[in-house]
Amino acid sequence: MSEQPFWQQKTLDDMSDAEWESLCDGCGQCCLHKLMDEDTDEIYFTNVACRQLNIKTCQCRNYARRFEYEPDCIKLTRENLPTFEWLPPTCAYRLLAEGKPLPAWHPLLTGSKAAMHGERISVRHIAVPESTVVDWQDHILNLPDRAR
């Protein structure tokens, strides 16, 4: 009889730092810049990638030192997770916090990121480099509700 994976055995609070980090599927959606409406506080996703995001791999170029390079970079923690209502519906942190299973394409289930990229969950199909953007409002998009 096989043992259940850690994300089915533990709460988010009980996970080790390594387990917590491994939940990230590496889609890069957190690394897309967001715009906030000053009147309504509504958050809009853009397809504008952070300067540190390698769009092809959807990985941070300087993950260990990302806050030095990008002071506005998001640090998702167990404590602040509830404040990130904008996390995509496919986000493992959000799904597990809501008592939902990981989607079938998640790298922890498939062993690679290929299925995630194939399902077009990652941003590598839509992201543009920040250095090429003139008018950020032209890059507002609606991300699909793709949790599976």
Swiss-Prot record:
Query: Domain of life of the organism in this record?
Result: Bacteria
Q: Which Pfam families match?
A: CxxCxxCC
| PANTHER family, per database record | UPF0260 PROTEIN YCGN
Q: Which NCBIfam families match?
A: PRK05170.1-1, PRK05170.1-5, PRK05170.2-1, PRK05170.2-5
The family database entries (HAMAP family) matched by this protein are listed as: UPF0260 (MF_00676)
Family (UniProt): Belongs to the UPF0260 family.
User: What is the protein's given name?
Assistant: UPF0260 protein KPN78578_22800
UniProt organism field: Klebsiella pneumoniae subsp. pneumoniae (strain ATCC 700721 / MGH 78578)
What lineage does the source organism belong to? Bacteria, Pseudomonadati, Pseudomonadota, Gammaproteobacteria, Enterobacterales
